[in-house]
Curated annotation (Swiss-Prot):
It comes from the Eukaryota. Gene3D superfamilies: 1.10.287.310, 6.10.250.3450. The gene is RPL35. It comes from Theileria parva (East coast fever infection agent). This is Large ribosomal subunit protein uL29. The lineage of its organism: Eukaryota, Sar, Alveolata, Apicomplexa, Aconoidasida. One of its GO terms (cellular component) is cytosolic large ribosomal subunit.
Length: 123
């Protein structure tokens, strides 16, 4: 089992990734069985390599799925919570720029009818 490179995994299709994932899980299961039966001590160090390879494959696969979901919901007004940008609580609850610039009817009428006062200093 050689070390997997993520940039190589990104070039593979979803079907190839899932097949590779199944193979890695099978290999991991055999290593775990050999660990319990204590037949191959040389294989114990490979367990970590296989576990990390499984994690890499799953990471690439899940990132791809999430990116596809983002593209799907890009045009819609409401997106799922897990696809929204991760912000602090204060930034999520903050008013939007449109909400900040909104004025009441009274404020709008006052701004229209009463021009801003200009003060001139006499020198």
């Amino acid at each position: 089992m050689e070390k997997l490179r993520v940039f190589e995994l990104r070039e593979k299709s979803d079907a190839e990734l899932l097949k590779l994932l199944d193979d890695l899980k099978q290999e991991l299961a055999t290593f775990r069985v050999s660990k319990v039966t204590a037949t191959g001590t040389s294989k114990l160090s490979k367990i970590t390599l296989v576990r990390k390879a499984v994690a890499k494959v799953l990471t690439v696969y899940n990132q791809r799925k999430k990116e596809e979901a983002r593209k799907k919901y890009k045009k819609l007004s409401k997106t799922p919570l897990n696809l929204r940008p991760k912000l602090t609580r204060a930034k999520r609850k903050a008013l939007t720029t449109k909400q900040l610039t909104m004025k009441t009817i009274k404020e709008r009428k006052r701004a229209e009818n009463l021009p801003k006062r200009k003060y001139a200093l006499l020198v």
